[in-house]
Curated annotation (Swiss-Prot):
Residues 349-1306 form a coiled coil. This is CAP-Gly domain-containing linker protein 1. Pfam families: CAP_GLY, CLIP1_ZNF. The gene is Clip1. Residues 146-182 have a biased composition (Polar residues).
Length: 1391
């Protein structure tokens, strides 16, 4: 089954689908339709490509029309979960869709309910299509088939013409049997080619075997035909080949399951997988029937055809024919001579006796010549048979020798391939080592870059230190200047400033001491670390030196081992060359002996011998060329191997040198870096010492500053004392005026002192500013110190990075040492492999010695067989001589000979059938071995696909069933409602109508009665009036006026009463008429309502009918799908039963919902179980595949052993068969000999009696002599016919010997020995299992016998449509089914 579903837009034809139960077209109409089907089918296979093109054409958001009549926008394009293949999701303009963008719980896009629909992209169009375009015009391309295609089909389907040199047979035989030349030499060629191709069949490239339409092929090894179809099919997955067979052994006429793939006669079409079909053009695939047909044609060849064939048998037959032709004119000449002698000597009886004697002598001479010719022919045939047997044995030996040599060459090739693999591995190792060396170089370069950066950093640090030194010198000068100023001016003030300065100086001193101690500790740790690193580097360098020395030693040992191995390889190759040369020499000697034996033969066999010589020379030249090519290949491979080994050694040396150089460079760089780092550390130490000296100088300055501060303190104390004195003086100023002058003087002094204080304050401010500047400078120095600390930290970090890099280098060196160790192990492995190869060479040499011993044994067997053949030839010559003696007096023995010929033909047919069976068995065995893996893969794929398809189809069917059930329920409810409404309305209208009618009828009856009564009353009154008038006129005189007035009053009263009654009746009539009008209007309204209800009912009936039709179409579709799912339903019977139960229980909605939830849960559980089962199955498949691979390997080994045993057994059985056949022939000939001896005795007695009668009746007339002559001529003709029969028998025996030799050469000698039942039972193969590629199942039937591709019954079923022929049946162009129009189609391809 194909993965992708075909697109819905098929070319709409009027042919029904295969599953539908509709009319079939008649034979007259079906013929052109069948002719057009191949052209339609030709465009069928690339449906998936067209579908992909449709998907590529459309874009999301594009406006399209579904089926040409439903407008909308594309919202989704791609694959879905509800069905395989490409789908398009469309949002329709109107709510005519089926969903809201989600199907089966998976959302693909969002839209309003009933506006979303999913369909195939092939059903979308960008324009609105009219109904005729959507329905009719699409059929044009599919229906119109060109006459060229039909003509081509008829030309291709015609059988190939037979060759001119073969006699024409009836039409069926020409179609059945492939053309084959009747030459026996060609048969021997094909036999030899088949032998060579038995060994080389597997080596034919796939490119040469690619099938094409029109190729001549074999299906299953026995059924010949022509390829008519190649590609994928709908009934099974994979590539299939449709073949039109030569014989009616097929299953169909090119169509399977309603889809036509090609056109042919019924029972001539057959579908098979591509791997089961083989071309006939290859020598290995010549059918056994072709060989048998060729043999039959050779046996039935006329002398005219024998003249055309230059084979040995034809030459012998030519000689026999020539002898018979040359003997006839001699007979006629002798007859003319005898007739002339009789004409001269008619006069007496003595003349008759002399003529009879002369005739007898002439007959004896003819018989002697015939015996000589027969003996020559027998010798030639026996010699040819011996030569053919020798050739067959020589070919067998040669083929075995070639196979052995090929096996050995294959072993050598495998060894060379192993050596090449080792080379590749060594090259990979070299490349890895190169990469590692490059990585090391890259890291060394990185280290050099980091060292350069460190050098730059050290230079910058040196410059900073120089600047700091300059700053320190300047500050020292400033301190000296401050000291001088302080010494020069020591005022009593500024005590507070000096205290703050002293505190700051003490803090700075503490910081400097801490920094100094930290710096000293770091320097000591760094020195210790550098010492340890240097020691570790020295150790690593020593280890690297030792590793490099070891690698060099190992390389030298490997070189020596490689040289030794190359020498051993060259020695082994020389030994092989010598052995091959000896084998070639022995083969040439054998061929020369065969040539000598051929040269001893008859001159007529020279053509065949020349062909054999040319074949042998060709084989020898091919063998020599192959040996030379193999030797050249070995030399080239050996030289290339040596060159590669040399290049590998050179590369190893280069890599080692590069490693040593890189190590030395790394060492030098490390030494230089260490030296530079030591110099830098010494510089930093010197600078630190200088800084310490400067710090000491600052301490001295601080001590001086303290002394100055103490002096200032003394001054301040003196000032305080002076102030106290001034206070005392002020107090004394009041008491003593004399002290004013002193006060003034003191004031002056005070003013001077104040001035000095002011000066001191100004100096103090200056000194404070200087102190601030000094503090700033100290802060800057602190910053510089922090920078130095940062630089030291950076240096420490660089040191740490260097340490890490040193560690990485150590690890790399360790890894290189490990790689060296691994290289050593690899080299040891290579050495071990070389030892293994040496052992293999020793084994091969021992096998060669065994083969030589086998050759000597075979030569001894050949000699024994030659002796046996000589004995058989001698026995055959004796038998032929006996037969010749018997045939001198032979009589009516033609019937027995024909029986013998018939028996021989039957035996030959049985032999041919056995050969066909053997070829079938061999092909089936090889095919089974090849197809085990394919079967497993197909089984997995088919199971997965079946599971997927089953789930998808199950979901689709469930959804469709739910939809159908909903529609059915709604339609049924609507129908019931409408029916109820209609029945109620009809019943109500009927009752009302009847009641109204009854009332009206009653009213009419009453009114009519009243009218009648009134009319009668009026009539009576009128009559009374007239009577009264007449009475009044008559009785005027007699009656009085009062009576008249009373009568008149009574009459007037009655008249008024009648008038009132009339008015009442008129009013009642008017009322009744009004009521009638209203009733009529109501009636009309009810009639209109009834008409409307009828129309509604008709519309609803039409809808119901359409629903029914849709339901029928859906039922048909469901039936088709059920037919398609029949195979799956066999596997899923339980699920089908559960679904059937659910279908029966679908009547109630509540039960449906409950069961739906239950089923969903069960489905989830089933899916889980299926996933678990799949996992288990995958595990089991993996284990089975492993076991299959193991069994296949064992089978291949056993097959190889069996083939060897078969080759030996075929030779022995061929000999047994020849011996048995000759024994049976000898027995039959002995029985014929006994019968012929009896007949000869009877003939001798008859001759004696004839002689007596001649002696007694010597004086008879010439009429008796003529009768005797006629009798003798008839006997001579009979003997000639017997000779011809014997020649034919000899030819048949020759053909039989050739067939036996061919069977022995083809390896089919097992079937010839059909009498050895015990041997057959022992060595019979197990019958292969049947397997169908379509159904993917074992043991049921073969692919060729699959019922799915069987042709349907030729008798079409009777039509079930019983409508009128004038009416047009509704036909849907979308579904291609009858029952509804395209406008009313509910497309199943949408979701």
């Amino acid at each position: 089954m194909s993965m992708l579903k075909p697109s819905g837009l098929k070319a709409p034809t009027k042919i029904l689908k295969p599953g539908s139960t509709a009319l079939k077209t008649p034979a007259a109409a079906a013929a052109p339709v069948e002719k057009t089907i191949p052209s339609e089918k030709a465009s069928g296979p690339p449906s998936s490509e067209t579908q992909e093109e449709f998907v590529d054409d459309f874009r999301v958001g594009e406006r399209v029309w579904v089926n040409g009549n439903k407008p909308g926008f594309i919202q989704f394009l791609g694959e879905t979960q509800f069905a395989p293949g490409q789908w398009a999701g469309i949002v329709l303009d109107e709510p005519i869709g089926k969903n809201d963008g989600s199907v089966a719980g998976v959302r693909y896009f969002q839209c309003e309910p009933l506006k979303g629909i999913f369909t195939r992209p092939s059903k979308l169009t960008r324009k609105v299509q009219a109904e005729d375009e959507a329905n009719g015009l699409q059929a044009a391309p599919g229906r119109t088939a060109s006459p060229l295609s039909t003509a081509a089909a008829t030309m291709v389907s015609s059988s190939p013409a037979t060759p001119s040199n073969i006699p024409h047979k009836p039409s069926q035989s020409t179609a059945k049997e492939p053309s084959a030349t009747p030459q026996i030499s060609n048969l021997t060629k094909t036999a030899s080619e088949s032998i060579s191709n038995l060994s080389e069949a597997g080596s034919v490239k796939k490119g040469e075997r690619e099938l094409k339409v029109g190729d001549r092929v074999l299906v299953g090894g026995t059924k010949a035909g022509v390829v008519r179809f190649l590609g994928e099919t709908d009934f099974a997955k994979g590539e299939w080949c449709g073949v039109e067979l030569d014989e009616p052994l097929g299953k169909n006429d090119g169509a399977v399951a309603g889809t036509r793939y090609f056109q042919c006669q019924p029972k001539y079409g057959l579908f098979a997988p591509v791997h089961k079909v083989t071309k006939i053009g290859f020598p290995s695939t010549t059918p056994a029937k072709a060989k048998a047909a060729a043999v039959r044609r050779v046996m039935a060849a006329t002398p005219a055809s024998l003249k055309r064939s230059p084979s040995a048998s034809s030459l012998s037959s030519m000689s026999s024919v020539a002898s018979s032709v040359s003997s006839k004119p001699s007979r006629t000449g002798l007859l003319t001579e005898t007739s002339s002698r009789y004409a001269r000597k008619i006069s007496g009886t003595t003349a008759l006796q002399e003529a009879l004697k002369e005739k007898q002598q002439h007959i004896e001479q003819l018989l002697a010549e015939r015996d000589l010719e027969r003996a020559e022919v027998a010798k030639a045939t026996s010699h040819v048979g011996e030569i053919e047997q020798e050739l067959a044995l020589a070919r067998d030996g040669h083929d075995q020798h070639v196979l052995e040599l090929e096996a050995k060459m294959d072993q050598l090739r495998t060894m060379v391939e192993a050596a090449d693999r080792e080379k590749v591995e060594l090259l990979n190792q070299l490349e890895e080592e190169k990469r590692k060396v490059e990585d090391l170089q890259f890291r060394v370069e990185e280290e050099s870059i980091t060292k350069g950066d460190l050098e730059v950093a050290t230079v910058s640090e040196k410059s900073r230190i120089m600047e700091l030194e300059k700053d320190l010198a300047l500050r020292a000068q400033e301190v000296a200047e401050l000291r001088r100023r302080l010494e020069s001016s020591k005022p009593p003030g500024d005590v507070d400033m000096s205290l703050s300065l002293l505190q700051e100086i003490s803090a700075l001193q503490e910081k400097l001491e801490a920094i100094h101690t930290d710096h000293q500790g770091e320097m000591t740790s760094l020195k210790e670390h550098f010492g340890a690193r240097e020691e570790a580097f020295q150790k690593e360098i020593k280890a690297l030196h030792t590793a490099t020395e070891k690698l060099s030693k190992e390389n030298e040992s490997l070189r020596s081992k490689l040289d030794h191995a190359n020498k051993e390889n060259s020695d082994v190759i020389a030994l092989w060359k010598s052995k091959l040369e000896t084998a070639i020499a022995s083969h040439q000697q054998a061929m020369e002996e065969l040539k000598v034996s051929f040269s001893k033969g008859i001159g007529t066999d020279s053509a065949e011998f020349a062909e054999l010589k040319t074949q042998i020379e060709r084989l020898r030249l091919d063998y020599q060329h192959e040996i030379e090519s193999l030797q050249s290949k070995q030399d080239s491979e050996r030289s290339a191997h040596a060159k590669e080994m040399e290049t590998m050694q050179a590369k190893l040396m280069k890599i080692i040198k590069e490693k040593e150089d890189s190590l030395e460079a790394v060492k030098a760089r490390l030494d230089s870096a260490e030296d530079q780092h030591l110099v830098e550390m010494e510089d930093t130490l010197n600078k630190l010492q200088e800084a310490e000296i400067k710090v000491k100088e600052l301490e001295v300055l601080q001590a001086k500053y303290t002394e100055q501060s103490e002096v200032i303190g003394n001054f301040t104390s003196q000032l305080s004392a002076v102030k106290e004195k001034l206070l005392d003086l002020d107090a004394l100023r009041k008491a003593n005026s004399e002290g004013k002058l002193e006060l003034e003087t003191l004031r002056q002094q005070l003013e001077g002192a104040e001035k000095q204080i002011k000066n001191l304050e100004t100096e103090r401010n200056a000194e404070s500013s200087k102190a601030n500047s000094i503090t700033k400078e100290l802060q800057e120095k602190e910053l510089v110190l922090t920078g130095l600390q940062d630089s030291l930290n950076q240096v420490n970090q660089v040191k740490e990075t260097l340490e890490k890099e040193l560690q990485t280098l150590k690890e790399k060196f360790a890894s290189t040492s490990e790689e060296a160790v691994s290289a050593q192990t690899r080299m040891q492995d290579t050495v071990n492999k070389l030892h293994q190869k040496e052992e293999q060479f020793n084994v091969l040499s021992s096998e060669l010695e065994k083969l030589r011993e086998n050759l000597t044994d075979m030569e001894a067997k050949f000699k024994e067989k030659d002796d046996r053949e000589d004995q058989l030839v001698k026995a055959k010559e004796k038998l032929e001589n006996d037969i010749a003696e018997i045939m001198k007096m032979s009589g009516d023995n033609s019937s027995q000979l024909t029986k013998m010929n018939d028996e021989l033909r039957l035996k030959e047919r049985s032999v041919e059938e056995l050969q066909l069976k053997l070829t079938k068995a061999n092909e089936n065995a090889s095919f089974l071995q090849k197809s085990i893996g394919e079967v497993t893969l197909k089984a997995e794929q088919s199971q997965q696909q079946a599971a997927r398809k089953h789930e998808e189809e199950k979901k689709e069917l469930e959804e469709k069933l739910l939809e159908l059930e909903k529609k059915m329920e709604t339609s049924y409810n609507q129908c019931q409602d409408l029916k109820a409404k209609y029945e109620k309305a009809s019943s109500e209208t009927k009752t009302k109508h009847e009641e109204i009618l009854q009332n009206l009828q009653k009213m009419l009856a009453d009114t009519e009665d009243k009218l009648k009564a009134a009319q009668e009353a009026n009539r009576d009154l009128m009559q009374d009036m007239e009577e009264l008038k007449t009475q009044a006129d008559k009785a005027k005189a007699a009656q009085t006026a009062e009576d008249a007035m009373q009568i008149m009053e009574q009459m007037t009263k009655e008249k008024t009463e009648t008038l009132a009654s009339l008015e009442d009746t008129k009013q009642t009539n008017a009322r009744l008429q009004n009521e009638l009008d209203t009733l009529k209007e109501n009636n009309l309204k009810t009639v209109e309502e009834l008409n409307k209800s009828k129309e509604l009912l008709s519309v609803e009936n039409q809808k119901m009918e359409e629903f029914k039709k849709e339901i029928e179409t859906l039922k048909q579709a469901a039936a088709q799908k059920s037919q398609q799912l029949s195979a799956l339903q066999e596997e899923n019977v339980k699920l089908a039963e559960e679904l059937g139960r659910t279908r029966d229980e679908v009547t109630s909605h509540q039960k449906l919902e409950e069961e739906r939830s239950v089923l969903n849960n069960q489905l989830l559980e089933m899916k889980k179980r299926e996933s678990e089962f799949r996992k288990d199955a995958d595990e089991e498949k993996a284990s089975l595949q492993k076991s299959i691979s193991l069994t296949s390997a064992l089978l291949t080994e056993k097959d190889a052993e069996l083939e060897k045993l078969r080759n030996e057994v075929t030779v022995l059985r061929g000999e047994n068969a020849t011996a048995k056949s000759l024994h049976s022939v000898v027995q039959t000939l002995e029985s014929d000999k006994v019968k012929l001896e009896l007949k000869v005795k009877n003939l001798e007695l008859q001759l004696k009696e004839n002689k007596r009668q001649l002696s007694s009746s010597s004086g008879n007339t010439d009429a008796q002599a003529e009768e005797d002559e006629r009798a003798q001529e008839s006997q001579i003709d009979f003997l000639n016919s017997v000779i011809v029969d014997l020649q034919r028998k000899n030819q048949d025996l020759k053909m039989k010997v050739e067939m036996m030799s061919e069977a022995a050469l083809n390896g089919n000698g097992e079937d010839l020995n059909s009498y050895d039942s015990d041997d057959q039972e022992k060595q019979s193969k197990k019958k292969p299992r049947l397997f169908c590629d379509i159904c993917d199942c074992f043991d049921l039937h073969d692919t060729e016998d699959c019922p799915t591709q069987a042709q349907m019954s030729e008798d079409p079923p009777h039509s079930t449509h019983h409508g009128s022929r004038s009416e047009e049946r509704p036909y849907c162009e979308i579904c291609e089914m009858f029952g509804h129009w395209a406008t009313n189609c509910n497309d199943d391809e949408t979701f």
